């Protein structure tokens, strides 16, 4: 009898929860329409995988790419609409959040064609790979629009869990397993610290979880200058720091970059930074409005350490992927300058602009690494010597992307850094900008060192990997080359037409 009553109560409670969820989705679904497209794509992938054979592999790529493109289209149609808060305050849609969602979708759209040939050559499971990529993209998009502490914690965990699985996708590779274990342990520790910071913020604000309500709660409780807020600030900075991977929270980055499959590294190197940057700007700018001097100081320290350590250690690397890992640590130092400058001096606009260029530069470089790795089986920098003699197209593409990363005019990377540093200088961050300029010169050195190897490798320096290299035609149906061409063009041409890009970025501010 007791069991029967409990069973009825369980059914009633489950029905109420389902009806409430259906009601929320019915009246708020339009606010997450781009995310719903991705969810529908995920369901289609699962259905095709369960009901068909491996001959339908092209359909899997087509559905993944189409769902991403449709999601981008839905975002563009929603552009310039009035800011809205939905799902009982859990989610916010505005131009600022949507530009970051667009960047994440752009990353994923470029990464899928970059992965096609790699997956086929390495015989990795296709459906699971695409499912993890789309789910991670979904988590990143929800993080960009998150408006309360619970969503800000759950969304990056969705992204992180898929990242752990993707980084350990080659289970038989010892380096991949080691990198995944380190990534998982450090990710779990950072999430715990992040929740600890949220608990202090929740308690100090009188039990509020929405970002703007936390500010009002801190004013009502007079706790905005309390030691608890300082503890929350430090803990949240550490938690977000792991996602952004600035120094000294970068320990996982080189190992994961080196040990994970190259398309996975390409995906993680940009999407994690875009999503974490979107979250960082809103968390620091809204709940910690009264502690702006403190978080500015913390981020300045992180930016200086990242720019110096990232670029100096990159000089000594012998692996291309490991070199790009330390390079990305230096690059995030530049992005942090935009976060510190904030909304007042176009800091966020400069950060968004540079992030757009960084996506093209970084993914273009990784596309070259994927292509070279599939044809030679190595990513050692020495083995790139003399590549121009065998494959001028690949060598020139690599050189353009590396020069753009270094900030050589008239490429996009130069104008992105110029705008970012100019905004920092206007905001009075003279020391930080000076460090950025000096470390940019250092980065040019190790990028040029690689380009010199590519173009002028002597016969005695050319390794068997390049001697036996299979020449590729200039025009090819190779999907990796398609992504590479798009990224190379985006790394060069936008530098000439900066004004429209800056205008769009400025239009996204709060």
UniProtKB/Swiss-Prot annotation:
Give GO BP annotations, semicolon-separated.
ATP synthesis coupled electron transport; photosynthesis, light reaction
Q: Which GO terms describe its molecular function?
A: NADH dehydrogenase (ubiquinone) activity; quinone binding
State the membrane topology.
Multi-pass membrane protein
This protein's GO CC annotations: chloroplast thylakoid membrane
Q: Which domain of life is it from?
A: Eukaryota
Keyword hit for Transmembrane helix: yes
Where in the cell?
Plastid, Chloroplast thylakoid membrane
Q: What class of enzyme is it?
A: translocase
Spell out the subunit comment.
NDH is composed of at least 16 different subunits, 5 of which are encoded in the nucleus.
HAMAP family according to UniProt: NDH1_NuoN_1
- Protein name, per record: NAD(P)H-quinone oxidoreductase subunit 2 A, chloroplastic
Q: Which organism is it from?
A: Nymphaea alba
